[in-house]
């Protein structure tokens, strides 16, 4: 993997959510800029539905491109978002504080057409996933405490496993699904963010500040298709 691609992988490992990164460069500098921008978000917490992911134009969502563009196509009639990656990596993100004391459950559905062959998700060279959903929490003025939790459909890691991202321990990965067993099925997921955060980072959390969706295959050069159902937060 060349140096440029390595840097882009580092940039997106849990910290691509803000427009400030569009021209921020990569690596540690980008991490600090992300944290600084998150620190400037409104301090009130919002609870409710995230913007629709199947409305044409995806209003409310922004896109960050890393290595080519993953094509995200809203499917209003099916109430789904189709993601198609062919050796590409870009993601959609939405910025808004959410009070996870009141609404700790993140809900979504997804369907994956295929997993990736020969990738080791615990290594930098294997940081590709047919489907993933992020939540990120700012560190306030303590920039280096900005952290991300990433729920993934892993290609080779077993379901239920958790590990630090290959590029930074400030992002942890959780394999909600793994392997080929449920390929082609639309599955509904429900995760308690506070419980998962405690397991990953050893601390409680009150607010998350951004949510993101991404299908990426730029490192492996393979292709992936996934369908996402509307994510939302709930009290139970």
Model-derived features with residue positions:
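Extracellular beta-strand elements of beta-rich domains used
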Residues: 211, 230-233
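Extracellular glycan-recognition surfaces and repeat-rich motifs
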Residues: 57-79
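Extracellular/lumenal carbohydrate-interaction signature centered on repeated Trp-anchored short motifs
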Residues: 95-106, 180-183
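Short carbohydrate-recognition loop motifs
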Residues: 73-91
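Solvent-exposed strand-to-loop "edge" motifs in beta-rich extracellular domains
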Residues: 109-115, 138, 194
């Amino acid at each position: 993997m060349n140096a440029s691609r390595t840097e882009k992988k580092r940039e997106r490992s849990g910290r691509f959510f803000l427009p400030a990164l569009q021209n921020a460069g990569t690596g540690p500098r980008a991490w600090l800029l992300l944290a600084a921008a998150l620190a400037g978000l409104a301090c009130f917490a919002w609870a409710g539905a995230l913007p629709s992911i199947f409305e044409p134009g995806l209003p409310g969502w922004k896109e960050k491109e890393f290595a080519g563009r993953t094509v995200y196509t809203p499917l209003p009639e099916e109430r789904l978002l189709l993601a198609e990656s062919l050796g590409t990596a870009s993601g959609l993100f939405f910025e808004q504080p959410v009070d996870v004391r009141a609404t700790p459950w993140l809900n979504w559905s997804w369907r994956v057409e295929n997993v990736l062959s020969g990738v080791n998700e615990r290594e930098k060279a294997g940081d590709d996933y047919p489907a993933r959903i992020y939540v990120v929490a700012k560190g306030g003025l303590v920039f280096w405490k900005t952290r991300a939790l990433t729920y993934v459909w892993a290609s080779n890691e077993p379901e239920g496993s958790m590990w630090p991202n290959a590029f930074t321990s400030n992002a942890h990965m959780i394999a909600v699904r793994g392997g080929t067993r449920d390929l082609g099925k639309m599955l509904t997921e429900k995760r308690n963010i506070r419980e998962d955060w405690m397991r990953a980072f050893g601390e409680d959390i009150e607010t998350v500040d951004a949510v993101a969706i991404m299908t990426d295959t730029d490192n492996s050069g393979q292709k992936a298709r996934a369908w996402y159902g509307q994510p939302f937060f709930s009290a139970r």
